């Protein structure tokens, strides 16, 4: 396969490497992901994360395995194992559905490579179109709040919500970005803060619990988040804490936007209640660990509830910013995300 490089993925000498997102920002460390078990482990441990990036990494690995001579049955088994790696992120399923079609072809090694590379290029283009559509909604002098990480680390391109923010800043419309630390794994504090710093976008890091106070003081002009899955009725599954922000924004009459590619749409999922929510290990809440070290602050044996995602009802969302443009609440209510409109 040809050499390929994005912010978080690299293909070199027919091997897949991922940027270890658990090591950032203290270390920039690339890890091999050249077999299914290894990539699944990287996904489970969030060394590779972000709904678009997970789907792309799985697709690239399948293509590389085919280049190494794995037969169709072995590739099908690999595909199903990868498909189960992150149940909430629908981009993974959508990408692998396309790879499955390529696998059915007579020339499947070449077809898988072509499809994987096509998915990467499409994601770059989708991100650019999302940024263009979303930046038009950002008013001059805006102070924006974002949650988790939705930039180039999570995609092959400029990102989704963070791509919007970055472009709006280049257009001179963003004066400050409030970055939720995003407990329990601190994707905002570790990753979004790092990306915004690299891009030269002014930001201030806040604890998640500070968002309400900022909104009450009139310090937030809009909230921008990404999505791991969008249901047919417009409900959105995203990083835990997103729903809280949507409720707060609604109360304070602040626009709340979701930015995502159409690959995040699940037109056959009727509503948020049907979205599977991944439950994660207690250790993520009882303490913290990373390249910066590890500490446990809760009592040993403390009972923990740790869902990775929550669901924001469509009624709290001001607009869904897709690569096809901005979708309004009225359009969603009229069936814009329904199966027969796909």
Swiss-Prot record:
Disulfide bonds: none
Site (Transition state stabilizer): 148
Binding site for substrate: 49-51, 86, 187, 238-239
GO molecular function, one term: S-methyl-5-thioribose-1-phosphate isomerase activity
Pathway: Amino-acid biosynthesis; L-methionine biosynthesis via salvage pathway; L-methionine from S-methyl-5-thio-alpha-D-ribose 1-phosphate: step 1/6
Active-site residues, Swiss-Prot/TrEMBL: 228 (proton donor)
Record has Amino-acid biosynthesis as a keyword: yes
Keyword terms of this UniProt record: Amino-acid biosynthesis, Isomerase, Methionine biosynthesis
Name this protein carries in UniProt: Methylthioribose-1-phosphate isomerase
Organism whose genome encodes this protein: Klebsiella pneumoniae subsp. pneumoniae (strain ATCC 700721 / MGH 78578)
Taxonomy of the source species: Bacteria, Pseudomonadati, Pseudomonadota, Gammaproteobacteria, Enterobacterales
Primary gene name: mtnA
